[in-house]
Amino acid sequence: MHPRFQTAFAQLADNLQSALAPILADHHFPAMLTAEQVSTLKNTAGLDEDALAFALLPLAATCARTDLSHFNVGAIARGVSGNWYFGANMEFLGATMQQTVHAEQSAISHAWLRGEKGLAAVTVNYTPCGHCRQFMNELNSGLDLRIHLPGRAPHTLRDYLPDAFGPKDLEIKTLLMDEQDHGFTLTGDTLTQAAITAANKSHMPYSHSPSGVALECKDGRIFTGSYAENAAFNPTLPPLQGALNLLSLNGYDYADIQRAILAEKGDAALIQWDATAATLKALGCHNIDRVLLG
């Protein structure tokens, strides 16, 4: 078990601990539960879906990287597949505050990058900020997405974001978590191809500036992130943050990164290179390359 889980795990009910122990035994537990695992945990612990999600929130919150605020937020995105995806907030010392990943963004990006096709609900331990409410409005689940908070009745995103502005106001038909493939040819080595594949998945209907990042760890593991734009622009999630989020959720640290590649178009309206390189260097990674999509 990764050390970050130990304190929260010890506070769980005994029957839930017994069911979770084999799942968490892997130091690189992927911070997700399959539909089958969720069903087993519900039956073993005698909890319904909502109660189980609340019980697991402290585990998700331990995944936070909050070197600046020291305020851990955890979230669980529940996919329409039945799979559950942990998320937690991330802050990057030496970078800028704009590089921060919110817990809801973390869980949603986690689900999207693992191939989830849509979300039924998001469970979070603190009220979603306006930034996250707007981010969630880009999803193909729209305003019907259920939001679950401790001590409150569940509500839809529509309740939390009245008079919402979103992609439909801009006549955008393809939404975040809809399947997309922009068709860029895979070239280069394995890491380069992973970055291009991530760029092919980009949700960028506003700038038409695809980008993807691939991070290679010292043990050979590769994590990728795809660019996810938002109708309100500022809640957009850069590809590096998606990749760093997956890396951290899987129990790796920034020091484990040995190489990074950004894939983007050289003539795009928006360029990720400077911000990507600056953030990676702040985290100690200097082996950074760029491949141009064509």
Swiss-Prot record:
What EC identifiers does the entry list? 3.5.4.5
User: Which top EC class is named for this enzyme in its record?
Assistant: hydrolase
- One GO cellular component, as annotated: cytosol
Q: Which domain of life is it from?
A: Bacteria
Tell me the active site: E104
The family database entries (InterPro entries) matched by this protein are listed as:
APOBEC/CMP_deaminase_Zn-bd, CMP_dCMP_dom, Cyd/dCyd_deaminase_Zn-bd, Cyt/Deoxycyt_deaminase, Cyt_deam_dimer, Cytidine_deaminase-like, Cytidine_deaminase_bacteria
Q: Which cofactor does it need?
A: Zn(2+)
Q: Name one Pfam family in it.
A: dCMP_cyt_deam_2
**What is written in the cofactor note of this entry?**
Binds 1 zinc ion.
Catalytically driven reaction(s): cytidine + H2O + H(+) = uridine + NH4(+); 2'-deoxycytidine + H2O + H(+) = 2'-deoxyuridine + NH4(+)
- Would the keyword Magnesium turn up in this protein's UniProt record? no
Domain CMP/dCMP-type deaminase positions = 48-168, 186-294
- Residues bound to Zn(2+): H102, C129, C132
Q: What SUPFAM superfamilies is this protein classified in?
A: Cytidine deaminase-like
User: For this chain's UniProt record, which GO biological process terms are given?
Assistant: cytidine deamination
Q: Please list the residues that bind substrate.
A: N89, M90, E91
Annotated GO MF terms:
cytidine deaminase activity; identical protein binding; zinc ion binding
Q: Which UniProt keywords apply?
A: Hydrolase, Metal-binding, Zinc
Question: What family does the Swiss-Prot or TrEMBL record give for this protein?
Answer: Belongs to the cytidine and deoxycytidylate deaminase family.
Q: Which HAMAP family match?
A: Cyt_deam
**What assembly does the database describe for this protein?**
Homodimer.
Protein purpose = This enzyme scavenges exogenous and endogenous cytidine and 2'-deoxycytidine for UMP synthesis.
PANTHER family recorded for this chain?
A: CYTIDINE DEAMINASE
User: Protein name, please?
Assistant: Cytidine deaminase
* Organism field: Salmonella dublin (strain CT_02021853)
Instruction: Point out the gene that encodes the protein.
Output: cdd
